[in-house]
């Protein structure tokens, strides 16, 4: 079967600024910077000797990145593009409530698409579910175009929707010109960071894994509704399925040396889910070797540590118009995922520009967590109670306005 990835798995083991500082003694080796709502590893990161030119590993429950190399470098994503294709498709399908057993006819344009593909001809039909299966499992380029044409009228219109979604997600280093990644255009690019954000959304919404976890699947080709003509076996391009504990996704990519071998992987072990991205590995299976190394690291000595609990007071600030301080409490538990070998934590409550009145539960700032003076995590602060502007300040404002 034709594919855009080849080879077999090698033998590998598996930021008005008010602040308050508090000290926490704990051990932690991973320190991070904050970008796009994620937190990133910034010190004591081991050299994993990875082959990809851009790599990233994150824990998905708290969007915490624990390993990174050139994660913001723009790269040609090749077939990894298809995770945005599927994410955009799910948005449309869910919005329009389209049944997954809907039949989709293959156009002449879709039928002639080259590269990784399924054997299907003009006028033949597949269900929507089968098209998505072919895209995710088998990386089928022609299925991607057929899906795009069905949902948006043309690939070009569908790609516009992909880029709109990227903009809405805040992906400033991502742009698409193709729905399947079958392009070498310098206007088609993304980063490991942006790709991780797309993949994370797919994981959180839950649809992708029921496709990406499948190693083999038969789909039926029809010459008309309820008129089957043959079966096609889909074989996953993900060589780690069944070979590495907990792996259940999600997408490979390759377009020659320009893209290198790419892979977005995810695995869940004992309730912890990790997400990895490798872009630009030049040797065959380098994308999978990188994934194994990152997963081994992330599942190694790491554990969860709760530093502070939900509703715990984390800082206070004075606001013009009241003698009372605005007190910030945690909206959620403050949890860190790390390997805790060394270090010291401190917290800094950074308040937004506040104006009265303030309502109980209103977001008023962010609590940053530091380790060795580097940001390792962040949490939202909300007001512990209502704070109103005192009558004396209201009266002073009115008197002032009389003379202005």
Predicted regions and their residues:
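Active-site-adjacent loops and short helices of periplasmic peptidoglycan-processing enzymes
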Residues: 5, 40-206
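Hydrophobic core
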Residues: 32-36
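Domain-terminus/edge residues, biased toward the C-terminal soluble/receptor-binding domains
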Residues: 171, 175, 186-189, 193-404
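Sec-dependent signal peptide recognition
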Residues: 22-28
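Basic polycationic patches enriched in arginine
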Residues: 14-17
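Cleavable N-terminal signal peptides
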Residues: 30-31, 42
